[in-house]
Amino acid sequence: MGINLVRKLLHKGHEVVSFDTQPFDYPERDLVEHVMGDIREKDALALAMRGSDWVVHAAAALPLNSDEEIYSVDIDGTRNVIEAAVSLGIKRFVHISSTAVYGVPKIGGMKEDSPLVGVGPYGKAKIEAEGIVAGFRDKVAATVIRPKSFIGPERLGVFSLLYDWASLGLHFPIPGHGNNLYQYLDVEDLCDAIYLALTCESSIANDTYNVGAREFGSFRSDFQAVLDRAGFGKKVRGFPVGPVLGILRLLDKLGWSPLYPWVYETAVKDSFVSIDRAVEKLKWSPQFSNSEALIRNYDWYVSHKADFSAQSGTTHRVPWKQGALGVAKIFFR
């Protein structure tokens, strides 16, 4: 998400400082002050923030990392970021959380005051991090944004599995019939929400907001839109929920799959949140439907596939290793 937000801020005429563990190797590198560092390094963090008016905290260790890394980055790191922001007199703070804080949904349409049930270390850490941020709201206008899984240019991660299979002309397997409603979010719409939170009245900013696509279809129909875009005439194929989830749980336990519990457990549930608060208070209006966002991301993947064909990792910047799931390709030609 970082580079997409950087581009938006530059387009709006702002000076931008990027603080990241990875080099800033984008075409805009000469337009941005980049500081390499880790949010667990307090001195480097404070140095990078000095002189800024706004801070957007989007750093996180994702579920493929170790439990220790997740808790260290997502909890301790968040505390460091907001403490530094307050000590330096930052005027506006935005924390990017996740709708994973709601856990595996029993019903769709969760609102910001719905119960929080973290699944796994990542979900639990996100809940605790939100609490840390909320504890500083008397000192800085602090927005917590809970996005649905967001996609778009420069974003890959788990969605690289779908795009890879689609681009190779393969059918794509899913657990169950796939008729459950499932909401995503385009990264451009997320950046719009962040910018609104940075520029609105402080009383409005000092709140928590769900953000997701306004228009979304079923799990099956939106994935099928990507296969249709690929143009090979392939289909999304559903398989019995029990056996598929059993296999995915086993592969996850053995470390042979990039899919973690929140991904595969929610894949068979209605998973969407209410965006009414963001629409009404932030005056946010998402542009992209699920299928539009997925197709936009797929098109970007295809046009840049050669650039990251030899890359993989545990961040959203690169494809994730498919593990045993990659072997299954031979059955879906």
What are these regions (language model features)?
Residues 76, 80-122, 143:
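Conserved Rossmann-fold NAD(P)-dependent oxidoreductase catalytic core, especially the SDR/UDP-sugar
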Residues 1-54, 58:
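N-terminal Rossmann/SDR dinucleotide-binding element
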Residues 200-259, 275, 291, 295-296, ...:
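Mid/C-terminal beta-alpha module of Rossmann-like enzyme folds, strongest
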Residues 117-146:
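Active-site Tyr-X1-5-Lys
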Residues 103, 143-161:
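Flexible, glycine-rich beta-alpha linker
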Residues 152, 174-180, 207-217, 227-231, ...:
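Glycine-rich Rossmann NAD(P)(H)-binding loop
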Residues 36-76, 84, 99-104:
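NAD(P)H-binding glycine-rich loop region in Rossmannoid oxidoreductase-like domains
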Residues 80, 128, 155-161, 176-198, ...:
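Substrate-positioning beta->alpha
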